């Protein structure tokens, strides 16, 4: 008996002295001696490597992380974990499985999600900028600053509120709205239009994804388009995700050197006009906390069930001096933010056109005719301002800050978007089955 045990040990050692990928020979050896297969199995991935991989790629299950570490091990070191190789394997796997999942869920209806807004620059020059030497191009544009407003609004849908609150989905939304804000300046989309311009979704999907922060760059080993980033998240979360609509701020184009200047046209002298962006969102989740940048007071990145993006023009010969003094910037931002709050908080459908803005109960849906209920105290010219129409408050604000100019409108809202989640989606009776419908059907409840 002892002799047979020794012979068995010799066979086991001989089998394991070679790499485990022995082909037919190893198969023959493992059939009579099952324990030899166990001896030749590669070492399990370490818990540390699994945890690190899941941390680098949020939404990755423990089983998928283990599979990636095992499948990506090089033949030369089959027992060594490589995070870098595992990341490459995961990315390739998500591209393959994500495309299949996207096709599978394409017929579903996505009613949940968020409306996100981003302002990279609100267009308001600091006192330091105003005291410095402005570029000739900026002076000709009449915007009074070397940087114009840049921002965007986008609605991204998913199937359930659970996914809408997920951190992976939230990061996708942040990156997409950041990309939309940069889209006009990096593409040929802007053309002759200015203000808030719709961005074609099909063009956006083919556009490179521009991460919203350095930390958001992630672990991707190759550049992503917006479309491939969505497929990547679909592979992780298993729900249909789609962009319903998107719009971006297109800043005024710089005129040619021989173009008529605003000071020559009689409208306002160069540098006395600024067009500022403001945004607000209501009904957001904790997973998408509003982002701030202490070095950029005009920066906004937030989302909710309803959001607004507003463009406001300030035009006064006295504006450059006020901006150089540096005492009015915070007051102006409080006013523009108040306008964005007003647009989002009330059913605001237009700026001042009674024909297209019917009265809803006691409150008009025309911005200028509404009582300025969302006016922040920092911008209020008087204690009674919240009860006064928006148009009247804007006029009073200009006088209060010594910016009134020959009876002209110093402050004007020139463009705005107020988007509410799901308002462009067909009613439930006309829509296809959603994820919840499929769950009820699978459970025999439908």
Curated annotation (Swiss-Prot):
Source organism: Mycosarcoma maydis
UniProt keyword terms in alphabetical order: Elongation factor, Mitochondrion, Protein biosynthesis, Transit peptide
GO cellular component: mitochondrion
Record's keyword annotation contains Transit peptide: yes
Transit peptide (first-last residue): 1-33
One Gene Ontology MF term: translation elongation factor activity
Any Pfam family: EF_TS
Protein's name according to its UniProt entry: Elongation factor Ts, mitochondrial
């Amino acid at each position: 008996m002892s002799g047979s045990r020794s012979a068995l040990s010799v066979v086991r050692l001989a089998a394991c002295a070679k790499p485990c990928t022995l082909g037919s020979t190893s198969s023959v050896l493992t059939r009579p001696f099952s324990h030899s297969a166990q001896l030749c199995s590669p070492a399990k991935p370490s818990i540390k490597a699994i945890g690190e991989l899941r941390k680098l790629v949020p939404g990755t299950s423990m089983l998928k992380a283990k599979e990636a570490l095992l499948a990506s091990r090089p033949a030369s070191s089959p027992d060594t974990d490589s995070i870098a190789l595992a990341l490459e394997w995961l990315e390739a796997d998500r591209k393959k499985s994500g495309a299949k999942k996207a096709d599978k869920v394409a017929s579903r209806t996505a009613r949940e999600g968020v409306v996100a807004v981003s302002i990279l620059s609100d267009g308001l020059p600091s006192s330091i900028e105003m005291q410095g030497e402005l570029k000739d191009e900026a002076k000709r544009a009449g915007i009074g600053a070397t940087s114009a407003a840049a921002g965007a609004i986008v609605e991204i849908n998913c199937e359930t509120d659970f996914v809408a609150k997920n951190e992976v989905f939230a990061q996708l939304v942040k990156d997409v709205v950041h990309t939309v804000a940069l889209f006009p300046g990096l593409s040929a989309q802007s053309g002759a239009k200015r203000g808030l311009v719709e961005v074609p979704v099909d063009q956006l999907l083919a556009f490179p994804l521009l991460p919203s922060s350095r930390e958001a760059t992630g672990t991707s080993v190759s550049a992503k388009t917006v479309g491939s980033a969505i497929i990547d998240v679909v592979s992780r979360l298993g729900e249909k995700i789609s962009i319903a609509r998107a719009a971006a701020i297109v800043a005024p184009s710089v005129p040619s050197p021989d173009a008529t200047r605003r000071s020559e046209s009689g409208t306002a002298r160069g540098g006395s006009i600024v067009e500022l962006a403001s945004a607000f969102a209501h009904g957001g989740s904790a997973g998408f906390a509003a982002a701030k940048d202490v070095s950029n007071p005009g920066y906004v990145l937030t989302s909710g069930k309803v959001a607004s993006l507003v463009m406001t023009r300030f035009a006064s010969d006295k504006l450059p001096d006020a901006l150089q003094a540096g005492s009015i910037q915070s007051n102006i931002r409080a006013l523009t933010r108040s306008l964005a709050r007003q647009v989002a908080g009330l059913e605001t459908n237009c700026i001042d056109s009674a024909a297209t803005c019917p009265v809803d109960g006691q409150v008009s849906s025309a911005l200028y005719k509404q009582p300025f209920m969302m006016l922040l105290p920092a911008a209020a010219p008087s204690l009674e301002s919240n009860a006064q129409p928006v148009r009247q408050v804007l006029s009073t604000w200009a006088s209060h800050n010594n910016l009134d100019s020959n009876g002209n409108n110093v402050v004007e809202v020139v463009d705005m978007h107020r988007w509410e989640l799901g308002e462009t989606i067909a009613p439930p009776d006309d829509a296809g089955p959603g994820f919840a419908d499929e769950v009820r059907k699978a459970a025999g409840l439908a």
